[in-house]
Every structure is written in C-alpha cells, then in structure tokens.
Design a protein with these regions (language model features):
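Ser/Thr-rich, Proline-interspersed low-complexity disordered segments
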Residues: 25, 30, 35-65, 339, ...
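Metal-dependent active-site segment of extracytoplasmic phospho-/sulfohydrolases and closely related
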Residues: 71-72, 90, 228-271, 304
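Substrate-binding rim/cap in mid-to-C-terminal beta-strand-loop elements of soluble/periplasmic
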Residues: 121, 270-311, 322
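Catalytic metal-binding/acid-base residues of hydrolase active sites
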Residues: 78-79, 209, 242, 260-261, ...
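Active-site His/acidic residue clusters
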Residues: 166-177, 194, 198-234, 238
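N-terminal Sec-pathway targeting helices
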Residues: 2-20
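Active-site-proximal alpha/beta segments of enzymes that process anionic O-linked groups
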Residues: 66-69, 77-199, 306, 320-324
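Polar, surface-exposed loop/tail segments
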Residues: 310-342
Length: 343
C-alpha cells in the first residue's frame, strides 16, 4: 500500500513536471515566433507610409539669343546728370535693363563732335583718325584707319548712318555705308531710322544733334537743353517700338552714348563735365548692372566689333567692355593712371 502511494505521488509530480515543460516551451516558442512578425509589420508599415518618388526632368537651359545686329545711338552733348533731370524715361528703362556707366566713361582730349565721333566709331585716338577739326572739310577726306563700318560692310552686313549734322559724313567712306541720311531734328531722324529698321540692318548709327545745338545757344542743363533731351527720348521710344514690332529687339544690341558733355555754353575741355559721357548697353548676352571700370569712347567700336564677331584691330586703342557681357577682363586701359587719347 505504501509502495502504491509513493508511485502515485511520483506519477503526479512527473506529470506536473511534463506540463510545466510543455507550457514553458510553448511560451518560449510563441515569443520567438511573434518577434519577427512584429518587426515585419513595422517594416511593412514604414514602407507603405513612404510616398512614391516622382522624377522631375531637369529643365534645359537655352543659350541667350545671338547678337545679329548693333544699333549705336549718340546724343550730341548729353551730360550724364541730365538723363534723370530731363527726364528720359525710355533711356532710364534701357539703362536699368542693361549695363551702364554714368561716372567712369570719357571721351577724347578734344571733346568736340567730329573728332569725338571719329574715335567712337574707329576705336582710334584723334592723332590716328586724322580728324583734328570740327567742321566739314570735304576735301580732307574721311577718318583714317579701319572703322566698324569698314568691318561690318566687308562682312556683308547692311550698314546705315542717320545723322543730324552734315560734317558727320567724314566719319566713314560712302562705299562702306549702304545708307547715309541727314535730318536736322530728332523726330525726322527717328522716322528714317524706323524705315531702315523695317528694311533690316546689321549696323546702324543714329545721331541726335539738338542737345548740343541748344546747349551752345541757351546753356547746358537749362530748360531748353533738357527739353531737347526729352524730345530725343521720345525719338528713342519710336525706335525701340519699331524693333519690337519687327521682332528684332531680342537679337539687337543697343549702345547709347554721347560724344561729349558741356557746361555753360561750351565744351572746350576745362571741366570734367565736358569729358564725361554716358555709356549704356542693352540687349542679348548683357549682364545688367553698373559698370565702374574706366571706359573710353573708342571702346564703343571695339565692343561693337566683338559683339558681331568682327576682327578687332591691333592698332585700336579701344577695348571691348567685356564686363558688360559678364566675361573676365582680357585687357585693360593703361588708363588706370592716364586715359588714352588724353596725351
């Protein structure tokens, strides 16, 4: 009987031990199995929450339009401080959209209409153009050296000159100008310019004479002088409108400048206001902003040639205004010490 009881107790204990092992094993197995399931659920949840990546195509940057033509406009005797005072809103807008200098550009040592324009269009100093005079001496011929009209015409570009003074005929030979017209006020000059724009051109020079004429008669910076500049600004508006209407504006480089300034009733070169000139450039490839580097009137010719891919001449004193195109300065005027053509 005692032996049976011991066996029964042993059997109960053994059974409980087996149950314990089964339960413990089940618990361990459950935790092992469930752990990766939890991880998998979290991983799946994370992937589902991530938005699908959208590939955005990179925009293609188009190059700026090619410069197909250059228009140079010269206001005879325009001072830099008269532009805002006149006022000249169309020129100011052109300036704001382009590169400009109102403080660092100068003309030659003899700040007069004919010799100054000769240097402007030839890239040469007065002693090299041979234009020492400011009157129309037909028998003396034309400005010497290779000028931008020589280069443009040789390249097959249609060349146009519309001026307000007869003596400017001596700036370029007749065989290099397809069109040469003289008119004596800004409205008439702009009318011819609009007609020539409609015909097409490669290089055009427009000269407005009235500021100089009125300055000599009534004085620089007076009411009549400023009125002539306002009239000239209205003429500029008509020219710009013609370029827009014909779809030429985006491929036209425009340079606006002057041959000299003036004070009182003259511009004999005794004060800086006689020498200082505005220099404004607007159009394709131009980086807007103020230019503070020294600029000479001869640089107008060099910049024009550079823009039209015409060969720069070794004997030119003029240098392209590279900064206006956002390009590094390849050459500088010795003029940080002394201006060329002022010797």
């Amino acid at each position: 009987m005692k032996k049976f009881k011991k066996s029964k107790i042993f059997y109960i204990r053994f059974t409980l031990f087996i149950l314990y092992l089964v339960v413990a094993t089940a618990l361990v197995f459950t935790s092992v199995v469930q752990s990766p399931v939890v991880v998998d659920i979290k991983s799946t949840s994370t992937v589902t929450a991530t938005p699908t990546a959208i590939i955005t195509p990179t925009p293609t940057l188009l190059p700026p339009p090619k410069i197909e033509r250059v228009l140079i406009i010269s206001y005879d005797g325009m001072r830099t401080d008269a532009i805002e005072k006149a006022p000249m809103p169309n020129l100011i807008k052109l300036m704001q959209n382009g590169a400009y200098s109102l403080t660092s550009a100068e003309t030659i040592a003899y700040p007069s209409t004919l010799p100054s324009h000769a240097s402007m269009l030839s890239g040469l100093c007065m002693q090299d153009t041979g234009i020492y005079y400011d009157r129309y001496f037909k028998y003396l011929g034309y400005s010497k050296g290779v000028d931008i009209f020589d280069l443009a015409h040789s390249a097959g570009l249609r060349t146009v000159m519309i001026v307000g003074k007869d003596k400017l005929r001596q700036l370029a030979e007749p065989e290099t100008t397809d069109v040469f017209e003289v008119r004596y006020d800004e409205e008439a000059i702009s009318k011819v310019a609009v007609e020539e724009i409609q015909k097409g051109f490669g290089l055009m020079f427009v000269h407005f004479p009235s500021p100089d004429k009125v300055g000599h008669k009534y004085g620089w910076m007076g009411y009549s002088y400023l009125k002539m500049l306002t009239n000239g600004d209205n003429a500029l508006e008509e020219i710009l409108k013609a370029l827009d209407d014909d779809g030429l504006r985006k491929t036209t480089l425009i340079i606006v400048t002057a041959d000299h300034g003036g004070h009182d009733k003259n511009h004999i070169g005794t004060v800086i206001q006689d020498f200082r000139i505005p220099w404004i450039i607007s159009g394709p490839r131009i980086v807007p902003g103020e230019l503070t580097i020294p600029i000479e009137t001869m640089d107008t010719a060099a910049t024009t040639a550079y823009a039209l891919d015409l060969p720069l001449q070794d004997n030119w004193e003029g240098i392209p205004v590279y900064e206006a195109f956002g390009e590094p300065r390849l050459k500088v005027h010795k003029a940080y010490i002394q201006h060329p053509c002022h010797e």
